[in-house]
A protein has these predicted regions:
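Lipid deacylating catalytic domains
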Residues: 1-69, 76-217
Length: 217
């Protein structure tokens, strides 16, 4: 278990402040990132803000590698971060990532209808929404870096093939973006009420799976 948790607040001008302090000998510290302006339209800005958090962690705590856990739109911000800064060796390097309810190829009733888009066995979507096309460079960025990926999504089992907000096809389309580049890629599907979009990250089984994946030797 980890006791060391701090929160990084990013103001709308991109300034980062930490609430709390990490001990120098902290094992597996957790940094929760809260963006003051967390909206879909600002992916490149959000990615830059995410980088600001990492550089501050680097200078204050000597972080040289990190694991990422994201929910919903946060996954897209992180994909944009990796697309823009993933090859920058001066930054802390990604070790493992957990994507929960990822919106890689859209959000229901925003840019796709229920059961409109499917993915094939490689995770390739039958229609690609923005910014999915641009994100296809991730395959090259993830190559040879030894990154491990756990992709968690929920199916309400109500015929929508979704968690109520995000289609399973949108979440599973991450597989096609990364191809064989990660060291490992695994999907984990949760079903029924506890798999609802907002419930997923409150779900104890999800929490346990995440802890195992990130920290079990």
């Amino acid at each position: 278990g980890t006791k060391d948790i701090i929160t990084a607040y990013v103001s709308k001008d991109g300034a980062v402040t930490f609430k709390g302090k990490l001990r120098k000998d902290a094992v597996n510290p957790i940094v929760k990132i809260e963006l003051e302006n967390n909206r879909q339209g600002y992916l490149d800005k959000n990615a830059a803000w995410f980088k600001n958090v990492l550089t501050k962690l680097q200078s204050e705590y000597n972080f040289d590698k990190f694991n990422f856990v994201g929910h919903s739109m946060g996954n897209l911000t992180f994909a944009q971060y990796m697309m823009t800064y993933g090859n920058d060796k001066s930054l802390p390097q990604l070790n493992k990532q957990v994507n929960i309810a990822g919106t890689f190829n859209g959000v229901l009733n925003m840019n796709e209808d229920v059961n409109e888009i499917t993915v094939d066995k490689d995770g390739k979507p039958s229609r690609m929404n923005q910014p999915y096309q641009q994100l296809r460079v991730l395959k090259d960025i993830y190559k040879g870096k030894g990154i491990e990926v756990l992709n968690i999504y929920g199916d309400l089992k109500d015929g929508t093939h979704s968690d109520g907000r995000v289609s399973n096809s949108s979440s599973k389309s991450l597989k096609y973006l990364l191809g064989n580049s990660p060291k490992s890629y695994r999907e984990s599907k949760y079903e029924g009420e506890p798999a609802q979009h907002s419930q997923l990250h409150e779900n104890e089984n999800v929490a346990n799976e995440l802890i195992d994946f990130l920290w079990k030797k």
